[in-house]
UniProtKB/Swiss-Prot annotation:
It catalyses: thiosulfate + hydrogen cyanide = thiocyanate + sulfite + 2 H(+); thiosulfate + [thioredoxin]-dithiol = [thioredoxin]-disulfide + hydrogen sulfide + sulfite + 2 H(+). This is Thiosulfate sulfurtransferase GlpE. The lineage of its organism: Bacteria, Pseudomonadati, Pseudomonadota, Gammaproteobacteria, Enterobacterales. It comes from Shigella dysenteriae serotype 1 (strain Sd197). It is found in: Cytoplasm. The active site is at C65. One of its GO terms (cellular component) is cytoplasm. Transferase that catalyzes the transfer of sulfur from thiosulfate to thiophilic acceptors such as cyanide or dithiols. May function in a CysM-independent thiosulfate assimilation pathway by catalyzing the conversion of thiosulfate to sulfite, which can then be used for L-cysteine biosynthesis. The keyword Membrane does not apply. It comes from the Bacteria. Its main location: cytoplasm. Keywords: Cytoplasm, Transferase.
Length: 108
């Protein structure tokens, strides 16, 4: 895959539930602590190395940000690092929280 794909929150939720992909959140630490999707890895410059070490490059990665814009750049970056399949989640955490309020965790 040379280009990431966009995915809606319903499809992302299904892939996460079926363990077909991993979910990363690239928002700032304060926003992440105020609420994030359950089963999310907080991907930052500081945690990127650990994420790449602990996740297979053939496991699809779904990238979440605030509204679905910043995630596109991060998704493209992960492809360039060697991940085979990467998705950018349309609507970001804002859409996730609206559609799946019970699937939101709080704290770091």
């Amino acid at each position: 895959m040379d280009q990431f794909e966009c995915i809606n929150v319903a499809d992302a939720h299904q892939k996460l539930q079926e363990k077909e992909a991993v979910l990363v959140d690239i928002r700032d630490p304060q926003s992440f602590a105020m609420g994030h999707a359950v089963q999310t890895f907080h991907l930052t410059n500081d945690t990127l190395g650990a994420f790449m070490r602990d996740n297979d490059f053939d496991t699809p990665v779904m990238v979440m940000c605030y509204h679905g814009n910043s995630s596109k750049g991060a998704a493209q970056y992960l492809l360039q690092q060697g991940y085979d399949v990467v998705y950018s989640i349309d609507g970001g955490f804002e859409a996730w929280q609206r559609q799946f309020p019970a699937e939101v965790a709080y704290g770091a």
